[in-house]
């Protein structure tokens, strides 16, 4: 349960209609199976102690007596199970019959949550047997104790501060204002839905979307367990489609028409953090609720969930293609607006033959096409210097010509050498002055050409470089519109590959594929034997690690220890723990120390959920101390 990770489960027992004794044993078997998976919150279907399809048998006192006796058996049989358990049953309260979720923990019944919305349309006749529940229905005596009854029950874990559980039943989810809305607003981070939803053609996908959507709206984990095989098939069939969703993502789903157990790991710390970040999610207000405490044994949750090593990149090929097209359009539309607003006659792009400048040129070409402007208005400038290789230079020239942009070449070596003489710098000393002088010379050239051409300079730097501060202040850091500013390096590759894969120009596609195969480098140091000598990832670390760290820090707000924990899962077999720790420390140090560069970024379009614009997503002081984060990293063990 460390870091907010909780194993949860849903299960559908094989019920025997109206045989509560048999059903109690089937339910206990499911509970034991979920316990073997270390589940700490368990959900079983609506009315599963009796079977949902008992119909007029619900009027029989014998059945109701048997149901209550069965609950006692389940409570006693689960006394050693370290979990909060929700199980469905009929319950007599104040002379009426309620359809309730019985909530148990370690053999004790903690509360009964009644169903509010009783369907009486189409195949459903629940109002024939049951009464709608309300917020506070007092207590009912069960097992010699007074047990609270009502929809206003919150079950809060004493030793996992962010684990707060509430329940609703089946139809409650399908109405315009589900009880789960108020539960979430009162602080519930986990919603249990005990359901008996019959199958019809197309209903499964709708149900899936409903559960996922509710978990997204409420920023919660939603555990949905529904009736399955064993229910009466007199008129209906129940498919047992169990679902576990978290903030819009389905983490686990059982096969329909199979009575299966679903297990997933949810992250309640992340959910509460996300709510805290959202100014439109109200502060928890639970004064109308009764809070019931329970405790769970402390143990570290085995992470039974997928952590994507490339969080910015969809793993599904079709989704990736659509996402790439969408991002390219966002970038191009942002630039289109700026071109139209400024009445610019041209756009100036410095082309190195590397990934970032390639993407910037492709986006600029698309923006010009959207405006119906000739691509000759794109002034693509190559500025070979001390570190330029034939490979990158030739690729730059070839792509400029293939795209129909205006080619311009301005070698920088002579100007930089003059600059070294002016400032009395020894050109044989390849230090930061040697490197940054080249970057600033290139920026000056681009700015002046933009003035000549009545245009503006297109920035090429990407999100990963900005996060690490891997840019020369007032050099490549500066432009007049930065189209790549919120595109991480791992995604830049996919955007360029997508453009190549879909291009009708075979020559251009070939150049783009070669750019993709070229090592990432600023090419500010002289080559060795004609090959790139300065490789960025050798200096600052693998971009796939840094992009992962960036996503987990800014999007998820995870602390260093949690990022390290999930990084080990995501990169298992690819990077050693020592390597992950080394570059995690580098990431934090660079992220904090380089904020001054991000505090004065040019405009640029946001394309994803993570961005570092000082006017938008990241309001961070340039002189913040990183010591707390570094200290935590240094306590971590490989």
Feature map (PLM): residue ranges:
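Enzyme catalytic cores with a strong preference for nitrogen-chemistry domains
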Residues: 1-350, 366-375, 407
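ATP/NTP-dependent adenylation/nucleotidyl-transfer catalytic domains that generate, transfer
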Residues: 23, 161, 220, 232, ...
């Amino acid at each position: 349960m460390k870091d907010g990770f909780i194993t949860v489960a849903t299960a559908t027992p094989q019920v025997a209609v109206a045989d509560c004794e048999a059903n109690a044993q089937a339910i206990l078997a499911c509970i034991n199976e979920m316990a073997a998976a270390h589940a700490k919150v368990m959900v079983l279907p609506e009315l599963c102690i009796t079977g949902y399809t008992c119909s007029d048998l619900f009027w029989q006192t014998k059945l109701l007596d048997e149901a209550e006796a069965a609950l006692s058996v389940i409570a006693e049989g689960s006394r050693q199970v370290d979990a909060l358990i929700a199980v469905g049953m009929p319950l007599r309260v104040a002379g009426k019959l309620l359809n309730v979720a019985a909530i148990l923990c370690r053999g004790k019944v903690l509360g009964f949550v009644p169903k509010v919305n009783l369907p009486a349309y189409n195949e459903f006749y629940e109002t024939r047997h049951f009464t709608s529940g309300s917020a506070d229905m007092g207590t009912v005596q069960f097992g010699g104790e007074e047990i609270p009854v009502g929809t206003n029950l919150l079950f809060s874990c004493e030793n996992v501060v962010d684990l707060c559980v509430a329940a609703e039943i089946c139809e409650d989810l399908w109405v315009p204002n589900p009880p789960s809305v108020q539960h979430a607003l009162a602080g519930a981070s986990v919603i249990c839905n005990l359901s008996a939803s019959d199958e019809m053609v197309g209903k499964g996908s709708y149900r899936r979307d409903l559960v996922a959507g509710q978990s997204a709206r409420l920023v919660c984990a939603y555990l949905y367990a529904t009736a399955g095989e064993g229910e009466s098939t007199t008129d209906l069939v129940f498919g047992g489609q169990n679902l576990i969703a978290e903030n819009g993502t389905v983490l686990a789903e059982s096969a329909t028409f199979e009575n299966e157990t679903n297990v997933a790991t949810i992250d309640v710390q992340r959910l509460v953090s996300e709510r805290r970040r959202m100014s439109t999610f109200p502060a928890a207000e639970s004064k109308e609720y009764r809070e019931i405490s329970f405790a769970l044994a402390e143990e570290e949750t085995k992470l039974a969930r997928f952590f994507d090593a490339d969080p910015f990149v969809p793993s599904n090929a079709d989704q990736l293609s659509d996402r790439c097209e969408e991002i390219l359009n966002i970038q191009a539309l942002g630039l289109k607006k700026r071109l139209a607003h400024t009445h610019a006659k041209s756009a100036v792009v410095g082309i190195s033959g590397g990934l970032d400048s390639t993407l910037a040129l492709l986006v600029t070409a698309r923006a010009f096409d959207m405006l119906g402007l000739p691509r000759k208005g794109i002034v693509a400038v190559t500025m070979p210097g001390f570190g330029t290789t034939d490979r990158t230079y030739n690729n730059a020239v070839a792509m400029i010509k293939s795209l129909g942009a205006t080619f311009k070449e301005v070698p920088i070596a002579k100007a930089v050498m003059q600059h070294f003489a002016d400032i009395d710098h020894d050109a044989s000393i390849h230090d930061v002055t040697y490197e940054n002088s080249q970057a600033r010379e290139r920026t000056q050239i681009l700015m002046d050409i933009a003035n000549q051409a009545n245009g503006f300079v297109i920035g090429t730097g990407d999100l990963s470089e900005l996060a690490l501060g891997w840019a020369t202040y007032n050099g490549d850091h500066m432009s007049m519109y930065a189209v790549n500013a919120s595109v991480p390096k791992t995604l830049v590759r996919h955007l360029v590959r997508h453009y190549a894969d879909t291009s009708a120009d075979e020559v251009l596609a070939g150049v783009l594929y070669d750019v993709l195969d070229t090592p990432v480098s600023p090419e500010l140091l002289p080559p060795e034997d004609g090959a790139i000598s300065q490789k960025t990832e050798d200096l600052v670390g693998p971009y796939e690690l840094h992009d992962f760290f960036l996503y987990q820090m800014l999007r998820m707000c995870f602390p260093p220890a949690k990022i390290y924990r999930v990084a080990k899962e995501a990169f298992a077999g690819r990077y050693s723990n020592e390597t992950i720790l080394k570059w995690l420390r580098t990431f934090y140090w660079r992220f904090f120390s380089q904020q001054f560069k991000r505090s004065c970024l040019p405009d640029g379009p946001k394309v994803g959920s993570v961005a570092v614009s000082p006017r938008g997503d990241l309001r961070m002081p340039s002189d913040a101390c990183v010591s707390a984060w570094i200290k935590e990293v240094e306590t971590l063990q490989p």
